[in-house]
Amino acid sequence: MKIKVKLIKGLAGKDQKQKQALRSLGLKKIYEERILEKNPAVLGNLDKVRHLVKVEEVE
C-alpha cells in the first residue's frame, strides 16, 4: 500500500530532528507532495512530523 504525503507547514523554527525526518521523506518545500511505500521507517518519520504534513492513502 502507498501513501501520499503533503507538507502543509513551513520548516522555519522547527527542531533539527523534524527537519531530518522531513528530508528523509523527500519533502523540502511547502506544499510539496510525495507518494511513498507504507513501511515502518516511513511511518516512524511521519509520526515525528504529523503536525506538519497531510497524509492520504492511495491505491
Swiss-Prot record:
Tell me the GO BP annotations in alphabetical order: translation
Q: Output the Gene Ontology terms for molecular function.
A: structural constituent of ribosome
Q: Which domain of life is it from?
A: Bacteria
Of the GO CC terms on this record, one is:
cytosolic large ribosomal subunit
Hey, which family's this protein in? Belongs to the universal ribosomal protein uL30 family.
Q: How does it assemble?
A: Part of the 50S ribosomal subunit.
Q: What is this protein called?
A: Large ribosomal subunit protein uL30
The gene from which this protein is expressed is rpmD
